[in-house]
Amino acid sequence: HLIVDEGGELCACGRRGCLELSLAAPHLRARLRAGGSGERAAIRADAGHSLGIALAPIISALNLNDVVLCGPPELLDGPLLDAARDTIRIRTLSAVSNGLDMRMAKGGEDLRLLGAAVLVLSAELGVS
């Protein structure tokens, strides 16, 4: 649970501006439904900005070259992904952000199941 906007909406945890409120699919879909058609790109871009705020220090600390997002492409691709990239570029050194490849995962819903299976295999059988 991470705060990305101190003046943001009240979260179920009692704090304001938590990343979940701007990025979790159910919350993002609700905001898109409530907004007009002209606001949808801005709502998605705002969520992408929040994602970039959360990811930038991690990308810098670990010097990551690749970030792969998994989730509903109709929500994550386009304005959200573009805004996340832009925010990361602003918040990291150019040596880090210039080499960064941030993209959508290919494989859809099965990736979540595969990730869970890998965690089980690793924890229970030592397979990595």
Predicted features by range, described:
Residues 7-10, 15-128:
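ATP-binding/phosphotransfer module of carbohydrate and carboxylate kinases, centering on a glycine-rich
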Residues 1-4:
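Short, intrinsically disordered, charge-biased short linear motifs at domain edges
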